[in-house]
């Protein structure tokens, strides 16, 4: 459904990292940008967020999510649930084509375009066209190594870029 990106996140204990590639693809066959930043710090650096999907839609969701974070004083779960409610019920928001991964030291969540809030069981998740590849790599590295979340997300995204034509190796990793 969503092309032109991969976002992967890993949470181990109180350490969490979110990584994204830099490729922006126009249509099915033209790379428009190699160095986009799809992972950001929010709420005074206490929350990480990454997006897959339409760039304009994702920026709208970032703005809405950041507003909810402020409204609920940094409570990630509450902000995510309230954004999901708005996403499901608001006529304009329902048309947005994007997904978000948001995380802090306590929670790692996926916010989908259907207004779902999903907290992965194993502290590992990925979205975007290269998401399945990055997810498989991150799960294996989490299970069989002692690498940090930062290193796991970097290596998982690097592997996804070897497989997915919509993902490049211009990797940005944010960690808290």
UniProtKB/Swiss-Prot annotation:
InterPro entries: ATP-dep_Prtase_HsIV_su, Ntn_hydrolases_N, Proteasome_sua/b, Proteasome_suB-type. GO terms for cellular component: HslUV protease complex; proteasome core complex. A double ring-shaped homohexamer of HslV is capped on each side by a ring-shaped HslU homohexamer. The assembly of the HslU/HslV complex is dependent on binding of ATP. Keywords: Allosteric enzyme, Cytoplasm, Hydrolase, Metal-binding, Protease, Sodium, Threonine protease. It comes from Desulforamulus reducens (strain ATCC BAA-1160 / DSM 100696 / MI-1). Allosterically activated by HslU binding. Disulfide bonds: none annotated. This is ATP-dependent protease subunit HslV. It catalyses: ATP-dependent cleavage of peptide bonds with broad specificity. Its main location: cytoplasm. It is an enzyme of class 3 (hydrolase).
